[in-house]
Regions:
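Expand to "…catalyze enediolate/carbanion chemistry for C-C bond making/breaking, isomerization
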Residues: 1-305
Length: 305
């Protein structure tokens, strides 16, 4: 199963055509077509009818495309029936609280892939943890299916469950995000998210701080609800040129040192040992993966001209 680099995910209500039609221009690594919270109950059926054609529209700019479904048992099968078609990269399961929910989701998706000629295991899962109950089960959930590629905290709903309002520094979800990182990293699942609110889309400075706090905890990307937030996420999760240059030199001098019999070398007054060397390799790998994503998006946009 190929897992591409994904820094930013732009969430769009699929029932608003003008948002979907412009999605490919927004620069996001992924577009998430929403059937859940952003779509009112009276619009659910109409939204489902729009998903199939919206997959191709949203993908025009080279982004991955997913659908956030409703967890409600009365709606989940209908949402999947409307969503699992060629061109779908992923399904986001909101308010997850058990491994069994993921396994049930997998059974339905497997069946639809077979029926619709989609290569097995094409559709990956993103898991949204939005309750303390879900957080307690996060470790089991993270290993419930090999399709799970990412997991993240939904800050607004999680705060609602805690009975608190989101704060400027996100202190009330600091532990939850840290725990998601802890359970995800050992099993190869990408931890995503914010330490702060997703809703303040006009205050980009505060949003950048929320993204940066999550990155510092070990998250690998974030979601957003407004196009202006996309560039912020991409910038925060892209290593700077200076950092990449230092990483490249660190790898070179360390490997030269090893050849000379030492595993600790000096680079511009900084020690480069095995952890620093390994971290430098991760930075270079991330930069290479981001370059591949940007190339894919640029080539897709060029074909539209």
């Amino acid at each position: 199963m190929t897992r591409m680099m994904r820094r930013s995910t732009l969430i769009l209500p699929v029932n608003i055509p003008r948002f979907v039609e412009k999605a490919y221009q927004r620069g996001a690594d992924a577009i998430l077509l929403d059937l859940e919270d952003a779509v009112p109950p009276a619009e659910k059926e109409n939204a489902r009818r729009l998903v199939k054609d919206s997959l191709a529209l949203a993908a025009k700019g080279g982004a991955e495309v997913g659908v956030r479904i409703n967890k409600d048992p009365a709606m989940l099968p209908k949402d999947l029936e409307a969503s699992v078609y060629p061109g779908l990269d992923g399904i986001t399961l909101p308010k997850a609280e058990s491994a069994e929910e993921v396994r049930n989701l997998e059974k339905i998706v497997e069946k639809l892939e077979r029926e619709r000629g989609i290569k097995p295991s094409t559709v990956q899962f993103s898991i949204l943890i939005e309750t303390p109950r879900g957080l307690l089960k996060a470790q089991e959930i993270a290993t419930a299916s090999p399709r799970i590629e990412s997991m993240f905290i939904g800050p607004e709903d999680y705060c609602l469950e805690l009975g608190v309002e989101p704060s400027a520094d996100g202190s009330e979800i600091f532990y939850a995000v840290s725990w998601i990182v802890t359970v995800c990293k050992p099993v190869g699942v990408r931890p995503m998210g914010l330490v702060g609110s997703i809703g303040g889309f006009r205050d980009l400075e505060a949003f950048e701080k929320a993204v940066s706090r999550a990155r510092q905890l070990g998250c690998e990307g974030a979601s957003c609800i407004h196009p202006d937030q996309v560039a912020v996420i991409n910038r925060v999760y892209t290593p700077t040129e200076d950092k990449v240059a230092f990483a490249r030199r660190a790898v070179e001098v360390f490997e030269e040192g090893v050849k000379k019999g030492t595993a600790s070398v000096n680079l511009d007054g900084k020690m480069v040992d095995i952890p620093v060397y390994n971290r430098a390799k991760l930075i270079l790998a991330r930069a290479e993966a981001i370059a591949a994503v940007e190339k894919k998006k640029a080539e897709a946009l060029a074909k539209l001209k």
